[in-house]
């Protein structure tokens, strides 16, 4: 476009030079004209007109109405405007030529007179030829003749040169060749005429030799003129060249667009391929979990059987106890004295165990109650059995009580610490009370003392049995213990212990009736001794846990402070987001990114659904396990405090998550700012590069996902570091032997850091890791067997500890079963947090919604606190259920029933939460898209304030209705149009530079806009090369730094290895601690593996992203370094890794393989260290080596790719060394902090340089993606192998199970717990990529589970009765709360969207009003121009009157004669050219041309010849007007056809609206059973139908009015026949005309106020405006007739002129009606699509909502695009209207002059008749145009009807699907909001249709008035013809007095002019046809575009239907694929 502008400037300068040359020539002619004959005069007179005609045609011909690309229109418009200016200049030159011709006529007359006198003198006085006076006359005549001949020769030379130039440029101007040939023919004729004149002058040359010299000089002058003509030809050639350049520029733009489109298509295909791969992975993963679930079910069935067996044993034991009761009664006196001593001993023992018994106070109190109950049960066995049943009922009632307690504890969430303290005080009080009651019972009486002694003995023995958990073999061997059990049989265990796995089945239960007192006391003392051992051991653990509690509480306080700081940051970010809603284009890109995120969420949701299914099954198993865990109530109570501490840790973790969320907010906001900078460069190619914009949006979305993944990885790393700290503290407090495991954990933490850095490179490692999982499981099996052997050796020494460990393991089984879900749920939590970050950016100005998001985040934090060990609690955190879960755990709900019910509740509510969150994200994305026009990127606006200072004035006008980028683009388009008027070439250059800058910014989205613009303008290639060189240097520097870090890391590895060796050496002596810690380590490995799997998926998504994520990673590194200095090294390595990953996927695979080798090496080291204790691990190591060999095969396959990309081998080696180095960097992080910080700062400064290398990476993206697909396939194969290995491990597990059954019952329970543990490890060890992150979560969850178990036992009795009520009320409250939240969010989001839409419509309305004001001003200018035209017409007629001999002087300045609507006589070539259809169509923005001047050649003596010439020109003008009338009639018929098409299209729109109403009604029928609030939609549709019927009635009324107006037109024709008697009333009518003009302005204002809805059909407006210009004077008369209906349309020429303006407005309204119908269709389609997608969302999933928003955004974008295009065309129409008004003003002045001249009434009548004929022709043309428009409307309506039918069918299908879903109630409120929006839309459509009908009626009325005006004009034209005939008769009389030669010349001249006029009319007709064809093609193109859009929408809707069908399932079960 810049080139086109420059070319326009050059053309302007060249034409200006030519015109100046012509002016100078004319001036010279005026100074030196001599006497010439009439023949010469006639010949030269037409020459200026011919020159002007040639130039005009050459300028206008290239601008024929050929369909130009949309991108060329601006250039052509500016070029045409320049041509208009040049034509005006030519008009001025022609005026000068006309004046010179008049002077030449005078000189010719003088020459004739002098010649006659000379001839007379020669005849009368032949002897006096040498006298002075004749000689003077001869010289004078010779001089005059010489000057004339010189001028003729000059013109001839110019014409000849022009002909030659045209021939030389024939190939470049093929389109002008025909006209050039005509011009050559004309020149030849002129030359022939000159030769003839030369022959005539030969006689004079015989009389005077000087005559021949004069002729020769004249020939020379003619040649000079021909040379000038050649220069004009050169100018034309230059113009054509510039047009060619503009065309080539447009072609280049088209090529760029195609390239971008191809890129976008390729990216879409790649994305689809990745989605397919992800789905395959999900299917395999779901299959794996299904298998594991089956195994868990089998295992827990065995557990249930075992529980039943234990229950039976308990019943037998109770019978024995009843028998022992009688024996104890007989020996009570003997035992009394021993009881006193025993009481003393017991109090002493209890004082020593006080620390442990403090946490068992509540259970002790319950045991006291049970002791008293058992005294009563001794009397009656039936009563005891009944009590046992009551206990069971109470146990089942606890669940309900716990549910009630949950609701109460929700209110006490903030006071949880105080509650814990109060509970501790209560426990102490209960303990003291128990002691007092015990003392009272002992001293009360002997019988009471004996009973108390028996109860205490039984309590002690039972407690000892519950803690010790003796094996069956031991109990068989120890007879005394059996006796004691028999003795204690009278006391039944507490209900919580009946089915506890901690209580084994007694192999013998024989009573001991003869048991002596001494034996009883001995047994009691032995039991107490064992109990004391247990108490001491628990005391040690308690002290350690207290230390850890202090540390964790401190950390919790720190995390709380950090959380508050993060909340403040969140508030600040929220304030910043208020101005971040201005990027409409960014919102579109966000739509794409959200779509990809939605797909990812869908996949994650599927995985989570499967995990939830497994969790549900595990919950059911935990319910069965509940009674087994009751024996561990005392230990769980002691662990309660620890659980609270872990919960505080969870709070801290939540705070950390929020900090990460805030960092992600800042990073994403930075990315948004930078993307807004990119959007500013899309101005010139906005329409063509929409697909490229979508592609870049996808890349940016991937970049955000990479940033998210890095944030998640860093969060995991921080959690792992915290876990390491906790583990170290625990190890220090427990035993020195745990230092080895601390070192091991430390090493694992280092490995985790490495894995986090290489998370994107480990995708191919999954199969190998799964093999390692199998080996690790085998190792675990061997270790377990060794542990069992060790336990057998030290069984008697550590009976108490084994019992406690058994209880813990039983509790950990549930925890481990739940730990599997933790990584997945954390991943889901991270994604939800990312959504929260998006909400923080999007919910500007909506504090309420943002507060809800904060509450959501708070609920997530609380869920993390309360759910720690249980992984489903994380999901409840997202669902807002974590608060209730944690509170219920603190209150002591049982692990079984409570877990099952809450999991079921979680399952239903979690799915709802996920759906609501996704819907919230989608709705917020929609809201952001609608509001981003003025609010989205305030931060970006601040950063670009300096740069956009020059553009703000242009942006302010549209800032409220579009985003900052969108406004900049629109303003740049306007500015480009303005610049196109001055410099087309400069605009082209700027356009190319913008394209290049856009491409580069698309590749480097993070760079600053200032540097990017400076670089991309001139030095892109050079700087790219320099940056590549610097990248290599940077790589070398990084390699050196990596080498340095590697050395330190190696040292750290050596230290870690030494620590591991020490730990292994200590492990032999500390087997029990090792066993406990080994279990923790296994759990950590399992959790870490799950986390590694999540990170691997994140890495896979990052690998597929564009490498522009380096900026986001850099920002993430900066934030993480500020929080933790240790994270700096990890982030730096992550940045380098991502950079290397962007360069080569093969490098990543190699690095992945190397890292896998390192992990294998570490695993070998660990296995070698364990060889000293576990010889059975050799087999596991052998299998590991086999898996490694398989991995080697994969590495060899990867080596093929690595060899092809061998260039990065050195860099991969450096990365490996850096990974090894960073393993030791954890210990040395403090010392390395400063150096790493400096290094990171240097890297950040150089990242800009490194980013340039991504240009080359884009070329390799295709190959890398192919390699990634191969890797994915290999990973799937490895997964299948892993499943096979898992099946083998299951077989090994069954063998281990058989071995475990051979052990004692206590060891059997341990084996059972270990089998459950193995199930968990097999799930987790195969996913070791999340190694250390899961370790921290494992530790936290373990502690929380212990505390939860303890609390469950403590609160069991208290909440037994309230649990049922609380559960019921809690479920209802949660459902109600969730529904209310969902409803509120949906309503708020939709309200915001409606407000944004209303604001946008308001802005458009204001813009339309501004445009209406502009049109009003243009109308005023047209009025002035009309008056000027009227004055010119008056001047012309005055000249004619003077020419008829009335004695009037010629006008001082010739005025244009509007003999035709826009054409003049042939001599007025410029007028012809200017008014050509080409110019009108292609130069809407140009200034109106100067009308052709009407020469006034009348001499002072009123030469009849001059009068005759003027009359001849007038006659020619009349004929031209007649021809134009015919053309206008044709155009009127075309308009009529268009009108018919528009009406048909309107009918189609009506029918489609009815179909839409039917579709909505069907949707209402489907949803009426769920929610009756949607019935309003049907009411709205009824209103719409009513409005349609009303519109139909109005249309019929309009047709009637049209018929009436036609009849009125006929009456007007009869009235115009009598207009001669009414011409005297013209003065009075003039005043009415002014009033009509004012009313016309009002009508124009009313029409312009609706132009904002009429923009889609402005393409056809140009053709209409062209025809309006051709018949401007006629339309002005029609406008007058429109306003002067009261006077029965008795108007003359002025009436026709006014009606012409009215006709123009009618045409605009007609086009507006069509555009309004189109936009109504588009808006209706968009709203229907929105309703459809809303229905799909409420029934299927919230993904449909996001797609709906995307579709709506696309529609809005397309609408905005069309609006801008039509805005340009409207500007052109405004220019045309301004020109028309100016011409109308000129014509008005002419009419006034005619009214003042009563003597010319006869001539005026004749002219009016000619104009009437023209008007009739225009009317015909209008009718044809209306018919074509109606046809077009009909077609569009048919298409819209089809679209509506399709949408209706889709809606019905969605409604049926929706009826099958259970969650439709939650979506009903959202649908209500959509219904309101649809109501508004339907109202809007109704209003638009009403306006359309009004416009149609108005158009019909105006058409009728135009017909009547045409009739009157025809009458006036007939009268003018009669007057012309009279004038011709006079001319014939005058011609008789002239020579025959002059008559012949005049005839030839007239014939030539007639031929030219015929040619001109033919070209105009052809051009009109081309215009119609162009409009038809444009219409078809629009139809095809709509069809494509419909097909695209259908495809997307089907895809969303398939996608949405997956997440929905019945709420009672987990969702399935």
From Swiss-Prot:
Keywords: Cell cycle, Cell projection, Cilium, Cilium biogenesis/degradation, Coiled coil, Cytoplasm, Cytoskeleton, Phosphoprotein
Cell cycle keyword on record: yes
SUPFAM superfamilies: Tropomyosin
GO-annotated molecular function: actin binding; kinesin binding; structural constituent of cytoskeleton; structural molecule activity
Residue positions, PTM Phosphoserine: 1460, 1470, 1476, 1483, 1486, 1490, 1496, 1575, 1660
PTM info: Phosphorylated by NEK2 which may regulate its association with centrosomes.
Chief location: cytoplasm
Bias-annotated ranges (Basic and acidic residues): 1510-1529
Stretches with biased composition (Low complexity): 499-513
Compartments (UniProt record): Cytoplasm, Cytoskeleton, Microtubule organizing center, Centrosome, Centriole; Cytoplasm, Cytoskeleton, Cilium basal body; Cytoplasm, Cytoskeleton, Microtubule organizing center, Centrosome
Region (Disordered): 464-518, 1184-1226, 1443-1575, 1962-2017
GO biological processes: cellular homeostasis; centriole-centriole cohesion; centrosome cycle; ciliary basal body organization; epithelial structure maintenance; establishment of localization in cell; establishment of organelle localization; photoreceptor cell maintenance
One Pfam family matching this protein: Rootletin
Composition bias type Polar residues, residue spans: 464-483, 1989-1999
This protein's GO CC annotations: 9+2 motile cilium; actin cytoskeleton; centriole; centrosome; ciliary basal body; ciliary rootlet; cytosol; extracellular exosome
UniProt feature coiled coil, ranges: 70-262, 318-444, 546-1058, 1091-1438, 1505-1704
Feature: compositional bias, Pro residues: 2008-2017
Similarity comment: family membership: Belongs to the rootletin family.
SUBUNIT field: Homomer. Interacts with KLC3, NEK2 and the N-terminus of CEP250. Interacts with CEP44. Interacts with CCDC102B (via N-terminus).
Function: Major structural component of the ciliary rootlet, a cytoskeletal-like structure in ciliated cells which originates from the basal body at the proximal end of a cilium and extends proximally toward the cell nucleus. Furthermore, is required for the correct positioning of the cilium basal body relative to the cell nucleus, to allow for ciliogenesis. Contributes to centrosome cohesion before mitosis.
Family annotation (PANTHER family): CENTROSOMAL PROTEIN 2 (PTHR23159), SPINDLE ASSEMBLY ABNORMAL PROTEIN 4 (PTHR23159:SF60)
Name of the protein described by the UniProt record: Rootletin
Source organism of this protein record: Homo sapiens
High-level lineage: Eukaryota, Metazoa, Chordata, Craniata, Vertebrata
Gene name of the record: CROCC
């Amino acid at each position: 476009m810049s080139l086109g502008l420059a070319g326009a400037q050059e053309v302007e300068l060249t034409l200006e030079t030519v015109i100046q040359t012509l002016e100078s020539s004319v001036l010279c002619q005026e100074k030196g004209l001599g006497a010439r004959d009439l023949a010469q005069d006639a010949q030269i007179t037409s020459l200026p007109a011919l020159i002007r005609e040639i130039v005009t045609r050459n300028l206008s011909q290239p601008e024929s109405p050929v369909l130009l690309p949309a991108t060329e229109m601006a250039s052509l418009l500016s070029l045409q405007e320049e041509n208009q200016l040049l034509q005006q200049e030519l008009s001025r030159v022609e005026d000068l030529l006309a004046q010179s011709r008049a002077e030449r006529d005078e000189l010719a007359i003088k020459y004739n007179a002098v010649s006659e006198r000379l001839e007379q003198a020669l005849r009368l006085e032949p002897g006096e030829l040498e006298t002075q006076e004749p000689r003077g006359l001869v010289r004078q005549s010779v001089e005059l003749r010489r000057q004339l001949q010189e001028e003729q020769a000059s013109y001839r030379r110019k014409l000849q040169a022009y002909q030659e130039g045209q021939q030389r440029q024939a190939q470049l101007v093929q389109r002008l060749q025909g006209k050039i040939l005509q011009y050559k023919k004309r020149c030849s004729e002129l030359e022939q005429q000159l030769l003839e004149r030369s022959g005539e002058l030969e006689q004079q040359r015989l009389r005077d030799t000087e005559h021949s010299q004069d002729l020769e000089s004249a020939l020379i002058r003619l040649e000079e003129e021909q040379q000038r003509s050649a220069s004009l030809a050169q100018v034309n050639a230059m113009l054509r060249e510039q047009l060619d350049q503009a065309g080539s520029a447009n072609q280049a733009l088209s090529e760029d667009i195609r390239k971008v489109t191809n890129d976008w298509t390729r990216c879409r295909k790649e994305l689809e391929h990745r989605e397919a791969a992800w789905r395959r992975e999900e299917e395999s993963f779901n299959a794996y979990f299904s298998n594991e679930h089956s195994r868990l079910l089998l295992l827990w069935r065995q557990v249930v059987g075992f529980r039943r067996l234990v229950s039976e044993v308990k019943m037998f034991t109770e019978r024995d106890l009843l028998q022992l009761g009688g024996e104890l009664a007989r020996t009570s006196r003997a035992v009394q004295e021993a009881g006193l001593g025993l009481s003393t001993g017991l109090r002493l023992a209890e004082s020593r165990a006080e620390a442990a018994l403090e946490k068992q106070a509540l259970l002790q109190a319950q045991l006291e109650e049970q002791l008293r109950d058992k005294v009563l049960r001794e009397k009656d066995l039936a009563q005891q059995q009944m009590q046992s049943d009551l206990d069971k009922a109470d146990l089942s009632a606890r669940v309900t009580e716990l549910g009630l307690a949950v609701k109460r504890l929700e209110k006490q969430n903030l006071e949880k610490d105080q509650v814990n303290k109060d509970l501790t005080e209560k426990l102490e009080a209960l303990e003291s009370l128990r002691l007092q009651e015990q003392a009272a019972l002992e001293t009360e009486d002997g019988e009471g003392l004996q009973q108390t002694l028996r109860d205490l003995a039984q309590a002690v023995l039972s407690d000892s049995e519950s803690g010790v958990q003796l094996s069956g073999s031991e109990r068989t061997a120890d007879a005394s213990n059996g006796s004691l059990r028999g003795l204690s049989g009278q006391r039944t265990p507490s209900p919580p212990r009946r089915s506890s796995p901690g209580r084994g089945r007694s192999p013998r239960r024989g009573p001991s009736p003869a048991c002596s007192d001494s034996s009883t006391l001995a047994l009691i003392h032995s039991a107490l001794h064992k109990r004391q051992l247990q108490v001491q051991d628990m005391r040690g653990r308690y002290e350690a846990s207290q230390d850890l509690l202090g540390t964790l509480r401190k950390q919790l306080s720190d995390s709380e402070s950090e959380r508050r700081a993060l909340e403040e940051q969140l508030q600040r970010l929220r304030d910043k987001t208020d101005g971040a809603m201005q990027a409409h284009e960014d919102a579109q890109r966000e739509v794409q990114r959200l779509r990809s995120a939605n797909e990812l969420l869908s996949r994650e949701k599927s995985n989570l659904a499967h995990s939830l299914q497994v969790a549900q099954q595990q919950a059911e198993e935990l319910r069965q396990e509940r009674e087994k865990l009751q024996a561990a109530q005392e230990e769980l109570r002691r662990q309660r405090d620890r659980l609270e501490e872990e919960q505080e840790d969870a709070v801290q973790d939540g705070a950390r998550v929020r900090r990460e969320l805030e960092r992600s907010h800042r990073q994403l906001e930075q990315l948004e700012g930078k993307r807004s900078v990119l959007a500013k460069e899309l101005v010139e190619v906005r329409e063509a590069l929409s697909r490229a914009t979508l592609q870049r949006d996808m890349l940016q979305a991937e970049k955000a996902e990479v940033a998210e993944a890095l944030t998640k990885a860093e969060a995991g790393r921080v959690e792992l570091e915290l876990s390491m700290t906790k583990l170290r503290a625990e190890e220090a407090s427990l035993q020195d032997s745990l230092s080895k495991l601390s070192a091991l954990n430390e090493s694992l933490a280092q490995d985790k850091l490495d894995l986090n850095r290489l998370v994107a490179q480990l995708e191919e490692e999954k199969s190998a890791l799964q093999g390692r999982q199998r080996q690790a499981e085998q190792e675990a099996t061997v270790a377990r067997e060794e542990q069992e052997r060790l336990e057998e050796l030290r069984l008697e020494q550590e009976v108490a500890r084994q019992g406690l460990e058994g209880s813990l393991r039983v509790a950990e089984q549930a925890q481990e079963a739940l730990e599997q879900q933790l990584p997945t749920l954390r991943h889901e939590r991270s994604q939800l947090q990312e959504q929260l970050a998006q909400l923080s950016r999007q919910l500007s100005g909506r504090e309420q919604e943002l507060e809800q998001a904060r509450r959501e985040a708070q609920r997530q934090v609380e869920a993390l606190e309360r759910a720690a060990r249980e992984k489903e609690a994380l999901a409840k955190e997202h669902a807002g259920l974590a608060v209730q879960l944690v509170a219920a755990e603190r209150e002591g709900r049982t692990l079984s029933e409570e877990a099952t019910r809450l999991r079921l509740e979680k399952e239903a509510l979690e799915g709802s939460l996920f759906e609501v969150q996704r819907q919230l994200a989608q709705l917020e994305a929609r809201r952001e898209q609608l509001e981003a026009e003025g609010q989205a990127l305030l931060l970006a606006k601040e950063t670009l304030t300096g740069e956009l200072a020059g553009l703000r004035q242009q942006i302010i006008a549209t800032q409220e209705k579009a985003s900052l980028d969108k406004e900049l683009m629109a303003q740049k388009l306007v500015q480009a149009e303005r610049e196109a008027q001055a410099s087309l070439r400069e605009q082209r250059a700027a356009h190319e530079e913008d394209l290049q800058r856009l491409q580069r910014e698309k590749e480097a989205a993070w760079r600053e806009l200032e540097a990017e613009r400076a670089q991309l303008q001139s030095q892109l290639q050079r700087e790219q090369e320099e940056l590549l060189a610097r990248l290599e240097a940077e790589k070398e520097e990084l390699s050196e730094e990596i080498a340095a870090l590697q050395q330190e890391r190696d040292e750290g590895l050596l230290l870690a290895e030494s620590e591991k060796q020490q730990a292994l050496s200590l492990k032999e002596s500390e087997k029990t601690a090792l066993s406990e810690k080994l279990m923790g380590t296994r759990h950590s490995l399992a959790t870490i593996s799950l986390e590694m799997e999540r990170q691997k998926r994140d890495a896979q998504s990052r690998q597929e992203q564009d490498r522009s994520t380096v900026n986001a990673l850099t920002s993430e590194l900066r934030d993480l370094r500020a929080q933790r200095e240790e994270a700096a090294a990890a982030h730096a390595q992550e940045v380098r890794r991502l950079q290397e990953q962007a360069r080569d996927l093969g490098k990543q695979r190699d690095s992945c393989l190397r890292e896998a080798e390192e992990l294998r090496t570490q695993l070998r080291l660990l296995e070698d260290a364990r060889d000293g204790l576990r010889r059975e691990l050799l087999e596991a190591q052998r299998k590991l080596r086999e898996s490694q060999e398989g991995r080697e095969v994969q590495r060899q396959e990867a080596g093929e790719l690595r060899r092809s990309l061998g260039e990065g081998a050195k860099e991969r080696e450096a990365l490996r060394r850096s990974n090894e180095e960073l393993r030791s960097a954890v210990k040395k992080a403090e010392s390395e902090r400063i150096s790493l910080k400096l290094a990171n700062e240097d890297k950040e400064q150089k990242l800009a340089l490194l980013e340039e290398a991504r240009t080359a990476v884009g070329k390799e993206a295709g190959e890398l993606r192919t390699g990634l697909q191969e890797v994915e396939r290999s990973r799937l194969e490895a997964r299948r192998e892993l499943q096979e290995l898992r099946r083998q491990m299951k077989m090994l597990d069954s063998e281990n199970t058989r071995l475990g059954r051979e052990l004692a019952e206590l060891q059997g329970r341990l084996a059972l717990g270990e089998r459950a543990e193995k199930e968990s490890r097999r799930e987790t060890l195969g996913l070791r990529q999340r190694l250390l992150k899961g370790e921290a979560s494992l530790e936290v969850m373990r502690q929380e589970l212990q505390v939860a178990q303890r609390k469950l036992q403590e609160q069991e009795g208290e909440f037994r009765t309230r649990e049922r009520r609380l559960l019921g009320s809690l479920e209802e409250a949660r459902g109600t709360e969730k529904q209310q939240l969902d409803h509120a969010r949906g309503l708020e989001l939709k309200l915001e969207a409606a407000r944004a839409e209303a604001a946008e419509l308001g802005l458009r309305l204001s813009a339309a009003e501004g445009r209406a004001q502009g049109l009003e001003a243009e109308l005023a200018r047209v009025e002035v121009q009309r008056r000027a035209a009227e004055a010119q017409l008056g001047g012309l007629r005055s000249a004619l009157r003077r020419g008829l001999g009335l004695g009037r002087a010629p006008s001082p300045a010739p005025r244009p004669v509007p003999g035709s609507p826009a054409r003049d006589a042939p001599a007025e070539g410029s007028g012809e050219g200017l008014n050509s259809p080409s110019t009108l169509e292609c130069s809407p923005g140009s200034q109106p041309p100067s009308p052709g001047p009407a020469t006034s050649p009348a001499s002072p003596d009123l030469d009849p010849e001059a009068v005759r010439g003027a009359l001849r020109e007038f006659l020619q003008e009349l004929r031209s007007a007649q021809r134009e009338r015919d053309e206008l009639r044709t155009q009127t018929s075309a308009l009529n056809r268009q009108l018919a098409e528009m009406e048909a299209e309107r009918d189609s729109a009506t029918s489609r609206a009815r179909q839409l109403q039917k579709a909505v009604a069907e949707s209402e029928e489907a949803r009426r059973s769920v929610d009756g609030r949607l019935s309003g939609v049907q009411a709205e549709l009824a209103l719409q139908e009513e409005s349609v019927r009303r519109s139909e009635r109005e249309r019929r009324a309009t047709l009637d009015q049209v018929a009436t107006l036609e009849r009125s037109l006929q009456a007007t024709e009869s009235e115009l026949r009598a207009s001669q008697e009414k011409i005297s009333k013209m003065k009075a009518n003039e005043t009415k005309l002014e009033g009509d003009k004012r009313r016309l302005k009002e009508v124009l204002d009313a029409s312009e106020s609706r132009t904002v809805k009429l923009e889609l059909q402005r393409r056809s407006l140009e053709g209409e405006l062209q025809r309006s210009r051709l018949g401007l004077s006629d339309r002005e008369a029609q406008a007058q007739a429109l306003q002067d209906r009261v006077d029965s349309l008795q108007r003359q020429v002025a009436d026709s002129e006014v009606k012409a303006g009215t006709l123009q407005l009618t045409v605009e309204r007609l086009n507006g009606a069509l555009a309004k119908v189109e936009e109504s269709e588009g808006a209706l389609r968009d709203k229907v699509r929105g309703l459809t997608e809303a229905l799909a969302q409420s029934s299927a999933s919230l993904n449909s909502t996001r797609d709906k928003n995307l579709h709506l955004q696309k529609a809005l974008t397309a609408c905005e695009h069309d609006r801008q295009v039509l805005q340009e065309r409207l500007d052109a129409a405004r220019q045309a209207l301004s020109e028309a008004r100016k011409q109308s003003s000129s014509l008005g002045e002419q009419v006034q002059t005619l009214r003042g001249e009563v003597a010319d009434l006869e001539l005026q009548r004749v002219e009016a008749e000619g104009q009437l004929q023209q008007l009739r022709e225009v009317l015909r043309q209008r009718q044809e145009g209306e018919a074509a428009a109606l046809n077009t409307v009909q077609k569009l309506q048919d298409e819209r009807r089809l679209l509506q039918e399709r949408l209706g069918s889709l809606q019905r299908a969605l409604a049926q699907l929706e009826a099958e879903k259970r969650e439709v109630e939650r979506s009903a409120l959202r649908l209500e909001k959509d219904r309101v929006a649809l109501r508004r839309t339907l109202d809007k459509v109704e209003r638009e249709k009403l306006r359309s009908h009004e416009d149609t009626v108005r158009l019909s009325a105006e058409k009728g008035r135009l017909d009547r005006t045409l009739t009157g004009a025809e009458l006036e034209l007939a009268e003018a013809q009669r007057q012309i005939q009279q004038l011709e008769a006079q001319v014939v009389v005058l011609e008789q007095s002239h020579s025959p030669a002059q008559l012949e010349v005049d005839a030839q001249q007239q014939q030539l002019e007639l031929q030219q006029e015929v040619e001109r009319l033919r070209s105009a007709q052809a051009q009109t046809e081309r215009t119609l064809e162009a409009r038809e093609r444009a219409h078809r193109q629009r139809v095809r575009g709509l069809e494509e859009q419909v097909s695209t929408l259908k495809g997307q809707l089907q895809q969303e239907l398939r996608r949405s069908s997956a997440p929905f399932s019945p709420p009672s079960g987990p969702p399935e694929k």
